[in-house]
Amino acid sequence: MLSVASRSGPFAPVLSATSRGVAGALRPLVQATVPATPEQPVLDLKRPFLSRESLSGQAVRRPLVASVGLNVPASVCYSHTDIKVPDFSEYRRLEVLDSTKSSRESSEARKGFSYLVTGVTTVGVAYAAKNAVTQFVSSMSASADVLALAKIEIKLSDIPEGKNMAFKWRGKPLFVRHRTQKEIEQEAAVELSQLRDPQHDLDRVKKPEWVILIGVCTHLGCVPIANAGDFGGYYCPCHGSHYDASGRIRLGPAPLNLEVPTYEFTSDDMVIVG
């Protein structure tokens, strides 16, 4: 009779490695084996064995307690020996270096120093901001040569009565007319209802004998001709606009009177325009 282990096939590893002898003439196919006793592993006791149980045994079992009190120096708990505690003594003032002394005695002096530094810093920042704003505004203002052309002085004695003289002012022609008494009376007698741009003669002059105008036609910007036209004042040859001796539009396509600039008589013989 064959052994059960010899007929088990693939299940032989999971079956017990034993055989049972049966009386007969045949020899058993599988010899009986005796299981060997396993050797016990030997631990290296020189090296510590780290596990959850061994580490938990080294942990502190008592609760952590922190004590706080007056005039008690602070204590540092070192988790690692390579950590350095920062020292800010170089940034502290001499009055507060000693932790055992009260800082209330030196508080007034420290506050005064802080206020002084803050005040000086504020004044410096305000002064710098003022200079920056001044330079920025001055950079946008007109240059010296432009300001020189902003005003012009005219000597009135050089202009004879009944004549008109042209000057260049701010890139534009400037007309200064010395009117006769007849022209003054003639322009003062004009009714406002006859004018396209109603304006009295006395409203356009500061002295009746002097008329100061910008010589640019209000139609398309041409330069009129003095002492010409149907009204004895100014005539624009571009499109036929007629102005009187006061610079008021009387005939033609121009919609407005000639512009009167800002001027001031500094004396009887001098006028400043601008």
Swiss-Prot record:
Its cofactor is [2Fe-2S] cluster. It is an enzyme of class 7 (translocase). Residues 187-272 form the Rieske domain. One of its GO terms (cellular component) is respiratory chain complex III. Gene3D superfamilies: Cytochrome Bc1 Complex, Chain I (2.10.210.10), Rieske [2Fe-2S] iron-sulphur domain (2.102.10.10), Ubiquinol cytochrome reductase, transmembrane domain (1.20.5.270). It is a single-pass membrane protein. It is found in: Mitochondrion inner membrane. The chain crosses the membrane at residues 104-140. One of its GO terms (biological process) is respiratory electron transport chain. Coiled coil: none annotated. The keyword Membrane applies. Binds 1 [2Fe-2S] cluster per subunit. Fe-S cluster delivery to the Rieske protein is mediated by components of the iron sulfur (Fe-S) cluster assembly machinery that reside in the mitochondrial matrix (including HSC20 and LYRM7). Keywords: 2Fe-2S, Disease variant, Disulfide bond, Electron transport, Iron, Iron-sulfur, Membrane, Metal-binding, Mitochondrion, Mitochondrion inner membrane, Primary mitochondrial disease, Respiratory chain, Transit peptide, Translocase, Transmembrane, Transmembrane helix, Transport. Residues 79-103 are mitochondrial matrix. Residues 141-274 are mitochondrial intermembrane. It is linked to Mitochondrial complex III deficiency, nuclear type 10: A form of mitochondrial complex III deficiency, a disorder of the mitochondrial respiratory chain resulting in a highly variable phenotype depending on which tissues are affected. MC3DN10 is an autosomal recessive form characterized by fetal bradycardia, poor feeding, hypotonia, hypertrophic cardiomyopathy, alopecia totalis, low mitochondrial complex III activity and lactic acidosis. This is Cytochrome b-c1 complex subunit Rieske, mitochondrial. The gene is UQCRFS1.
